[in-house]
Curated annotation (Swiss-Prot):
Gene that specifies this protein: tyrS
MF-aspect GO terms: ATP binding; RNA binding; tyrosine-tRNA ligase activity
Role noted for this protein: Catalyzes the attachment of tyrosine to tRNA(Tyr) in a two-step reaction: tyrosine is first activated by ATP to form Tyr-AMP and then transferred to the acceptor end of tRNA(Tyr).
Keyword set includes Transcription: no
Protein name (record): Tyrosine--tRNA ligase
CDD domains: S4 (cd00165), TyrRS_core (cd00805)
Binding site for L-tyrosine: Y35, Y168, Q172
Pfam hit, one: tRNA-synt_1b
GO biological process, one term: tyrosyl-tRNA aminoacylation
EC number(s) from the headed UniProt entry: 6.1.1.1
Oligomeric form and interacting partners: Homodimer.
Source organism (scientific name): Clostridium botulinum (strain Loch Maree / Type A3)
Amino acid sequence: MSNVYDILKERGYIKQLTHEEEIRELLGKEKISFYIGFDPTADSLHVGHFLQMMVMAHMQKAGHRPIALVGGGTGMIGDPTGKTDMRKMMTKEQIEYNCNCFKKQLAKIIDFSEDKAIMVNNADWLLNLNYIEFLREIGVHFSVNKMLTAECFKSRLEKGLSFLEFNYMLMQGYDFLELNRKYNCVMELGGDDQWSNILAGVDLIRRKESKSAYGMTFTLLTNSEGKKMGKTESGALWLDPEKTSPYEFYQYWRNVADADVEKCLRLITFLPMDEVRRLSSLEGAEINEAKRVLAFEVTKLIHGEEEAQKAKVAAEALFGGNVKDLGNMPTAYIDKDDLNNSLVDLLAKCEILPSKSEARRLIKQGGLYVNDEKVTDINLVLTEEHVTEDGIMIRRGKKNFNRIVVE
């Protein structure tokens, strides 16, 4: 079996690592336990977590054991990384519910049977810490001068950084130490924005335990313009089908820019690299084949083959003009009483768009269509005249479709 390090390197996941030669040798000759942390601030994972899941799956396929650490304890503080404001603190009940949702989603591509992967909650050890003991055992190993040079803190110093958040790096470092002691976890993985926190944990284990520990970060999923992928007009692209339907999920990947196809095929599918290279070499109209494969493969991973097939059929029916096969399109249901209300109100009420202001903005920009007719009047009222045999068809931009059915 080839070394998983080489697989991760070839597919373009790896951004930074602490000890390159040692890590490659370790992954080639031993089966290790490693961990990735998940911040339970929502009840669903989103596309921003997708790379972490893929790396975990590649590592597990090579015989290594993933530990999914949910931050039930740190989530009650909030990670300052990449944030300009202090996060809202969450209740234990919210965090526990979110953790359960995460495990169901992770289990779609990670095997949790027979301890092949485990999920742990850092609340188990953080919430009962003795503050004095923690300062004496852990705090003594952290230099404030060094911490202040970390990017996650530098960007917050001018606007204000609470002592609560300043402790986050110590907590994350302590997580790694606890996992090392309990599960012989020797490596922490994460997005490149976690580099400073990962280094802190590696250094803590080497100081406290006089043992080797390693860290690796991977690239963030960005498009050719450097912007994070996974954002839509309706907000984040969620992995929960109740928040982002399989059809919308499929359509997002079907419509990525030509320049992003190769990167997405490498990073978020398990297609062999020879097939990735073949699909990525297609040009002109043929690149659509690669986009269809990408959309199907990614949707299959998250929602299963049946839902991926339904989304594919719905998308092809739409572009082929066959509106009889659109049962899998995102559909909102309203009462007859809801007619004779403004389009803007209904779009917000049906959650087709996140707000009335977003609906108005789209109309002003000429990007909203009802039954394939451009909407030019912000005050347009939907009436029975707009209801066709298949409902009211809403199009946002060129390729985002929804249907409103009157019951």
